[in-house]
UniProtKB/Swiss-Prot annotation:
Biased composition (Basic and acidic residues): 337-347
Gene from which the chain derives: Tprn
Annotated PANTHER family: TAPERIN (PTHR21685:SF1), TON-B BOX DOMAIN (PTHR21685)
Record InterPro entries: Phostensin/Taperin_N_dom, Phostensin/Taperin_PP1-bd_dom, PPP1R18/Tprn
Protein name per Swiss-Prot or TrEMBL: Taperin
Chief place where the protein resides: other
Region annotated Disordered, chain positions: 144-348, 502-586, 636-673, 730-749
């Protein structure tokens, strides 16, 4: 091989003429481009060899690469940028080799803000923070439709040239979002309330995804207002619309069931002052494919209009904006919850009988990436209603791992809800009526409150709690429904595993078994016992599996009343918190596939000893053919005379016409049976005809018409089976026999 290596240069010098010509052209072109370095274009061999060697050398020395780098240097667009930005006050530019950094000068006094407002129909804010692992995981399966929600009011606004806002300083962004100035010409309804100071650290993601304290002046909390004009268009991008559009006013009255503008909560709603943004969001979301994400519970501010919004749109209040679509913004810069790696569950603490909990634990143990989303507690006073909405989404996303807090939380929710019960219900109803599209029956906050109250009462059905608690520890959705409550001390903790859908499916599968008639979580309508499917159809081929709430409170309905209304209430809570009206809509309009009863997920990565797909039917019998050297003569048996005699009657008619002469030729009684078969040996398995398989009564088919042979085998087999066979040895057939063997004890195999 070394010799070959040494010879390598030789072939290069003797390269074919066509290759040499190509090289010459290339070099000539290079020379012309590089400014007259064409002297090297001589076609002599050594030069060409050098060119080839050079082209195979390091990239930095590659003539083509050199040429390209020189060409790029000539244009120097970065230089123009530098010069341009150097003249901008308050902007500092730093130039590295291939990087140009333009940032606001730290010490530079901020420019005097224009009339406290942005004069644009839409402002696009881009945010750069890298999404966390969970965000990336979720976005990987996120539907791309997120940016434009169908029917979202924003879509219908005049699209003015968007103003990308440099994300250089969060402070700048924040004011932008916060204070679409009252002066802004677009604002139609009410001047923006005084801009509430927002910490610079707060990010757009937070702005869009978390509840913010309501304005002290009673105007809608920044969160509510923000959702009014903030639309998330990407993992870290938002489109900002001026607040105060008429739609907001309309939505305000209708959409925020709990937070109706009139709601006594007043500023706390953060919705009263400004149009209930959540409602607007909801319409967007609603119009959007209902099932895109597990709708944040209707209670979320975005979903505040309890009735229509199928998903709480990524309203600020939504603790976990619909987990899939807005997750990155929510997780990357969100003060509503924090993400921690989840600890591995302790299998010893799980009761052996709790199969679901153990399967979930096993799943989590084997999961490569498991995270816990822990909601951060906020002062409920800021947005009593919003808080509840905020919580609901969490319920949707999170697995309530703290059922104990449920009672108090429920109570608080109930207390906060009474005001909502009246107006929100009516508003919701109106909203639903106007929004004919929103299938979800207006589930008034009152209803929710009532439902919550029910669970608040000590759950009599706690038998399931034993099972539920371990599961909750593992991230079994516990009080997710309850999560809809206003922010409560015990917030549900969400576990996100890389394979969470399997867990969810498993839980769902298990729950249906526990409660046969339990309505699916998804209906927001009084759950119908028939709907057990936990699958939320998110698009044409995507199904989101939302785990059924398994906490004792929820299970009470499941266990006590399979079909009862109480079950309905609990399930409805489930549905609301988990899916929202969208799911309901989908349930009513689309065929759910598959239903929960059809899905049984036993564990994500659990290795099953036996596949559950194996079809072991009595009809499928294996035919085992074995040859024992010591008893070969018993391997091939002929049916006994009596069995053949019985068959004869049946088969004579079929085979009479065929080979009559042959049948008569057979003389001995022992061979008479073969007349039926047209003197052919029948091979019977050694076990006897009972095991009649394909070979139990075999007649060489090449010797008779195929149709006859088919009929014969069909008829023979059943009769053969009835009587024990008679052992016979096989001897070579005589000339006049059609079969290859006859039964005369002469030849042993």
């Amino acid at each position: 091989m070394a010799g070959l290596g040494r010879l390598d240069p030789g072939p290069r010098t003797v390269m074919p003429a066509w290759k040499r010509e190509i090289l010459e052209r290339r070099r000539a072109k290079l020379a012309a481009l590089s400014g007259g370095q064409g002297s090297g274009a001589a076609p002599d061999g050594p030069n060409e060899r050098l060119v080839l060697a050079e082209s195979l050398g390091p990239l930095s020395q590659n003539p083509f690469m050199r040429l390209e780098s020189e060409r790029r240097r000539g244009t120097r667009p970065a230089q123009q940028l530098l010069e341009l930005y150097c003249r901008v006050p308050g902007v500092r530019t730093i130039r590295a080799d291939n990087i140009l950094i333009i940032e606001s000068a730290p010490g530079f006094p901020p420019a005097v803000p224009p009339a406290a407002g942005i004069r644009a129909a839409e402002v696009v804010v881009y945010e750069a923070p890298q999404p966390g692992r969970v965000s990336r995981l979720l976005e990987k399966f996120d539907s791309p439709a997120a940016p434009c929600r169908r029917g979202s009011p924003e879509r219908f606004r005049p699209a003015l040239p968007q103003l990308p806002v440099a994300s250089a300083s969060a402070a700048t962004r924040t004011p932008t979002n916060r204070s679409l100035a009252p002066a802004s010409p677009v604002r139609l309804s009410q001047p923006a309330p005084p801009i509430s100071p927002v910490p610079v650290a707060q990010r757009a993601g937070q702005r869009s995804a978390c509840c913010e304290p309501a304005h002290p002046d009673g105007t809608a909390g920044p969160g509510a207002r923000r959702s009014d004009f903030l639309q998330k268009t990407g993992s870290n991008s938002f489109t900002v619309h001026p607040r105060g559009l008429p739609r907001s006013a309309v939505n305000r009255s209708l959409s925020n069931g709990p937070m109706t503008q009139e709601s006594p909560t007043g500023p706390a709603n953060g919705l009263s002052g400004s149009p209930p943004v959540p409602g607007k969001w909801k319409p967007k979301v609603e119009s959007k494919e209902p099932s895109l994400h597990p709708p944040p519970s209707p209670g979320t501010p975005s979903a505040t209009s309890v009735g229509p919004p199928a998903f709480p749109a990524p309203s600020p209040a939504s603790a976990t904006p619909s987990q899939r679509q807005w997750v990155s913004s929510a997780t990357s810069a969100n003060d509503s919850f924090e993400i921690r790696p989840s600890s591995k569950p302790d299998m010893e603490t799980i009761p052996i009988g709790d199969l679901q909990a153990r399967a979930l634990a096993n799943l989590r143990v084997n999961s490569r990436n498991s995270f816990v989303l822990i909601p951060k507690r906020k002062a409920p006073g800021n947005y009593p209603l919003a808080g509840r909405q905020f919580e609901e989404p969490k319920g949707e996303v999170g697995w309530a791992s703290q059922s104990q807090g449920l009672g108090s939380q429920l109570v608080s929710t109930v207390d906060g809800a009474p005001a909502l019960e009246k107006s929100p219900l009516a508003a919701e109803m109106q909203w639903a009526v106007r929004k004919g599209a929103c299938p979800r029956p207006a589930i008034s906050d009152t209803d929710k409150c009532v439902r919550w109250q029910r669970p608040a009462s000590p759950p009599p059905f706690l038998p399931a709690t034993a099972e539920a608690e371990p599961a909750e520890g593992l991230g079994v959705p516990g009080l997710a429904k309850n999560g809809q409550e206003p922010v409560r001390p015990g917030l549900p903790v969400t576990f996100i595993d890389e394979v969470d859908s399997e867990e969810e499916a498993f839980q769902e599968a298990k729950l249906p078994s526990s409660a046969v008639g339990v309505p699916s979580q998804y209906h927001l309508h009084p759950a119908r016992p028939g709907h057990t499917s936990e699958l939320l159809n998110r698009g044409s081929n995507t199904f989101t599996v939302v785990p059924k709430r398994k906490p004792g409170t929820l299970q009470e309905p499941h266990l006590s009343q399979t079909n009862g209304q109480s079950q309905q209430g609990a399930e409805e809570q489930d549905a609301e918190s988990l899916s929202g009206p969208h799911t309901t809509l989908e349930n009513t309009l689309k065929k759910r596939y598959p239903t929960v009863h059809e899905i049984e997920v036993i564990g994500g990565y659990l290795a099953l000893q036996k596949s559950c797909l194996i079809k072991a039917g009595s009809s499928r019998k294996k035919m085992k053919i074995s040859f024992n050297d010591k008893s070969l003569h018993t391997t091939f048996e002929y049916p006994s005379e009596s069995s053949l005699a019985q068959e004869e009657a049946e088969e004579e008619e079929e085979e009479e016409g065929e080979e009559d002469g042959e049948e008569e030729e057979v003389g001995p009684d022992s061979e008479k049976p073969f007349t039926v078969f047209l003197p052919r040996a029948t091979f019977v398995s050694s076990v006897g005809p009972e095991s009649s398989s394909g070979l139990s009564s075999y007649t060489p088919k090449h010797s008779m018409a195929f149709s006859k042979w088919q009929e014969q085998t069909l008829v023979q087999t059943p009769t053969d089976v009835e009587l024990p066979p008679k052992e016979v040895m096989l001897t070579p057939a005589s000339q006049n026999d059609l079969s290859d063997f006859r039964s005369e004890p002469a030849l042993y195999f």
